[in-house]
Amino acid sequence: MNPFSSGTRLRDMIRAIRACKTAAEERAVVRKECADIRALINEDDPHDRHRNLAKLMFIHMLGYPTHFGQMECLKLIASPGFPEKRIGYLGLMLLLDERQEVLMLVTNSLKQDLNHSNQYVVGLALCALGNICSAEMARDLAPEVERLIQFRDPNIRKKAALCSTRIIRKVPDLAENFVNAAASLLKEKHHGVLITGVQLCYELCTINDEALEYFRTKCTEGLIKTLRDITNSAYQPEYDVAGITDPFLHIRLLRLLRVLGQGDADASDLMTDILAQVATKTESNKNAGNAVLYECVETIMAIEDTNSLRVLAINILGRFLSNRDNNIRYVALNMLMKAITFDDQAVQRHRVTILECVKDPDASIRKRALELVTLLVNENNVTQLTKELIDYLEISDEDFKEDLSAKICFIVEKFSPEKLWYIDQMLKVLCEAGKFVKDDVWHALIVVISNASELHGYTVRALYKSVLTYSEQETLVRVAVWCIGEYGDLLVNNVGMLGIEDPITVTESDAVDVIEDAITRHNSDSTTKAMALVALLKLSSRFPSISERIKDIIVKQKGSLLLEMQQRAIEYNSIVDRHKNIRSSLVDRMPVLDEATFNVRRAGSFPASVSTMAKPSVSLQNGVEKLPVAPLVDLLDLDSDDIMAAPSPSGTDFLQDLLGVDLGSSSAQYGATQAPKAGTDLLLDILSIGTPSPAQNSTSSIGLLSIADVNNNPSIALDTLSSPAPPHVATTSSTGMFDLLDGLSPSPSKEATNGPAYAPIVAYESSSLKIEFTFSKTPGNLQTTNVQATFTNLSPNTFTDFIFQAAVPKFLQLHLDPASSNTLLASGSGAITQNLRVTNSQQGKKSLVMRMRIGYKLNGKDVLEEGQVSNFPRGL
């Protein structure tokens, strides 16, 4: 007999496929068999239909397409015999899913079989419906399934309950139809029916709030009694698993009680005793007992429970941490991370065990335990926990050092009791895992060092000793090079010795040796080499006796393949050779970097509630990155070419703070084209924003000069961010310089502002702030409107760092004068005024419209309010 003939049995086809040695042979066998099956389908021979479908199911499991046999499933389902129906329903569940249109044709057959007199046929239909039920089928067949929940046979009731779960997931609107039927299943004695009934109730509670309240009031006590009976029941062989009576039912009941007790104190009180009983009586030496205990802990943590029961639950998790099974330890760590929000002290008792998990060979457990330890750290235990983590950092795997060092740095920055301790711990991390430390961490360390003037000598000596031993740690070398460049004289002269230090002797040549090694080492990157060059330039002034050696090291870098290094070497050599008279002032110590300002810039320029556009940072010469600033255009949802204006709250660049423009490129580009004219406002001229006043022209020229300082010296940028801007004094003199700017005219004086009158408006009002606009026109210039904004504080708290920003469409031009103050007193006891000038290029055709943003600090927290003004008077 040919093994591939139409009469091949399923067993023979499987044997032939398994005998194939290559995938090509297998495809040939399957292709031949599928062709024979298609031929038989076309002949519509009912004799071999069940055999063909069985073959198709096997072929489908191998991954080959079998869509041509879907109609055969429907034909077998419609046949009267039970064997044919069984194969047909099996094929239906395997070859089809709920997205197939063919399912529309099987709904009628399912309805007939659900009403069949043979309970086994009913069971087949329920199984199929529970597996592939679609929303349309659920609506059509829900009444039959609801009726079958009350069927006399427990197997049918069990399958009907599972099928009901599928139906309410697909069509939540049908949930209320199954509430009473589901409640009746909770009284069943048959464990199979009971567990499906509990699952159905659980689904109903998560989908329908009314069902949740119904089960909470009507069924909570019954569920508690059922759980108590199962917990206290005698040995039952048919349900016993490792000494636990039906752990699956235990778990389902606990999950349902968790939903019922969550957010309801009365229901939680009812289940307190049984949860304590389950937690204390369940054995934890087998996996089944651990599963029940875990669900019990989950329930205790979720309900409105007392602290005593939560302490019991946390102690159970502590025992889990000592288990040899990695899965149990992992879930215990996960649960403890949730439990720490409820009872920190109870979790702290297991701190030693959790620390041991950080050293676990399993990577997942190590990472989760490290996250938990980070949550456990506070001001009282930071010293002990940090010591433990740093000790482990020395022997940890390379793969784990990055995560571990990042967490240690986070802990040290957040909880350090003093700067000396902070510096010591950071140096230990840099020594052990310096190459894994991120840039912002060592930047922050430098900021802290610069602020700790009494520790400059101690720090530079500690770094010098560390870099001699751990020269392969790139980040450590960078910090050491920076500190030696800044405080090399303190290193050589042993200035600022602390009692905990041992005296060391370091010569000027020794200090330069460290810098030379950093710049000549083959694996040093460009950042380290650039920082080393800067340090050499600074040491040439601090160590005049070896300035020639320093000069020789700098000259060697003229031949560097890196353009940046070449340029620096040439410029620094010129400074050492030709500009000795200004060298000492050029290489003076950097001004103290403001920690608060640095932290703000590190976290972002705007509050977290304001979305900022991703933008590359601006690299500054000392390696510190300037964070990008979100453009006001994006914040106010206007077109990118709309014109915007706002007064700068500090001495920083107008463009950088408001528009997010690269201040280095803009200033350099302008300087390359022409020299700035004295007394002209270059920024406003470039942007064509409006007509500046002479006083503002002079300050803008100063602002342009400060741009170069910001680029060359980040510390100036940090300082200017926190310094208030000087108020501008309007004057009417020096009008001749405006003739150079294509007919721009000086700002109108108050005496000349007496155009037509317009009614004032309330531009913006919230529960805490009110903004009023008053308007006036300049005679002979109807396109320009003078607006005076008055800001009133309606809240009982004073606003500080107040700033008003605005943006207008591109047919408008906007100019803002400085505000009268940056502090807005509480309860309307004082007001801030600010003058705006709006030029409407389409005056008479389009009305004024403005988007505005108001920022201020309330009790030290940044607050941001936004609004749109569209109720300007007509004619503006």
From Swiss-Prot:
Keywords, in A-Z order: Cytoplasmic vesicle, Golgi apparatus, Membrane, Protein transport, Repeat, Transport
Boundaries of every GAE domain copy: 756-873
Membrane-protein topology: Peripheral membrane protein
Function: Subunit of clathrin-associated adaptor protein complex 1 that plays a role in protein sorting at the trans-Golgi network and early endosomes (TGN/EE). The AP complexes mediate both the recruitment of clathrin to membranes and the recognition of sorting signals within the cytosolic tails of transmembrane cargo molecules.
Top-level taxon: Eukaryota
Keyword Nucleotide-binding: no
HEAT repeats: 97-135, 136-173, 248-284, 308-345, 346-382, 384-417, 418-454, 506-545, 560-599
Assembly, per entry: Adaptor protein complex 1 (AP-1) is a heterotetramer composed of two large adaptins (gamma-type subunit and beta-type subunit), a medium adaptin (mu-type subunit) and a small adaptin (sigma-type subunit). Binds to EPSIN1. Interacts with DRP2A/ADL6 (via C-terminus).
PROSITE patterns hit by this protein: GAE (PS50180)
Family, similarity comment: Belongs to the adaptor complexes large subunit family.
Principal subcellular localisation of the protein: Golgi
Record-given protein name: AP-1 complex subunit gamma-1
Gene Ontology BP annotations: intracellular protein transport; vesicle-mediated transport
Protein transport as UniProt keyword: yes
GO cellular component terms, semicolon-separated: AP-1 adaptor complex; nucleus
Location of the protein in the cell: Golgi apparatus; Cytoplasmic vesicle, Clathrin-coated vesicle membrane
Gene it is expressed from: GAMMA-ADR
Signal sequence segment: none
